[in-house]
Amino acid sequence: MILPSLLVASLSALAAAGPVPPSALEARQSESASDLENGICKPVVLIFARGSTESGNMGYIAGMPTCNALKTKLGSDQVACQGVGGAYTAGLIPNFLPNNTDQASIDEATKMFDLAHTQCPDAQIVAGGYSQGTAVMDGSIQALPDDIKSTVKGVVLFGFTRNLQDNGQIPNYPKDQTKVICAPGDLVCDGTLIITPAHLTYALYAGEAAEFLASKVSA
């Protein structure tokens, strides 16, 4: 594990100089999605937690690309997207806590799952997270009440910060409903918080993530 100051420096340098896929540049135009909070229900609801320092509530590195890819796969009229915002501010320091995020952020994700369950009872829920957002989802999903957890059909985790600690899965959630995507060279997946350029490439894997999530929802 590295010091917070070094992590800040790494993220700043990589954000400024690291290669960014074209799809990620397009997604920067819109980094938020709040369908649930706007009262919109569709057959499939994607709830996503962005990575540290990303703006909006979805982020451009993995969140919005996954939302867009899932809409392309299933149809825009079939998919609602909701980012985890509010108390989850995607700050850097919570990465260094025992759960790699803080309880307020986990609770905010749980709030979104509860909203989807109560507001859209017939919807099939899928979820995702990137970087610190994977820890947010990990902490939330493993503690969901069974009646809500059973409606979460699939989860994708990009650059899973608890990949080593949790053995590549979310505790108390079916492993076959979870896809961990780790880019070659992403040391975060090896149990460190060392940020390499590979950690910024996950827009490239949005199609793969969407394929997995689509395979977990019924037609």
Swiss-Prot record:
Q: Identify the Pfam families for this entry.
A: Cutinase
Q: Which reaction does it catalyse?
A: cutin + H2O = cutin monomers
- What is its subcellular localisation? Secreted
Q: Name one GO cellular component term.
A: extracellular region
Keyword Oxidoreductase in annotation: no
Query: Per the UniProt entry, what is one GO biological process?
Result: carbohydrate catabolic process
Task: Tell me the active site.
Answer: S131 (nucleophile), D186, H199 (proton donor/acceptor)
Going by the UniProt annotation, this protein carries glycans at N99
A GO molecular function assigned to this protein is:
cutinase activity
Q: What are the residue positions of the site described as Transition state stabilizer?
A: S52, Q132
Q: Which Gene3D superfamilies match?
A: alpha/beta hydrolase
Which residues constitute the signal peptide according to the record? Answer: 1-17
Q: What's the EC number here? A: 3.1.1.74
Asked if the record carries the keyword Signal, the reply is yes
Task: State the protein's purpose.
Answer: Catalyzes the hydrolysis of complex carboxylic polyesters found in the cell wall of plants. Degrades cutin, a macromolecule that forms the structure of the plant cuticle.
Q: Which PANTHER family does the entry mention? A: CUTINASE 1-RELATED, CUTINASE 2-RELATED
**Name assigned to this protein:** Probable cutinase 4
Q: What is the lineage of its organism?
A: Eukaryota, Fungi, Dikarya, Ascomycota, Pezizomycotina
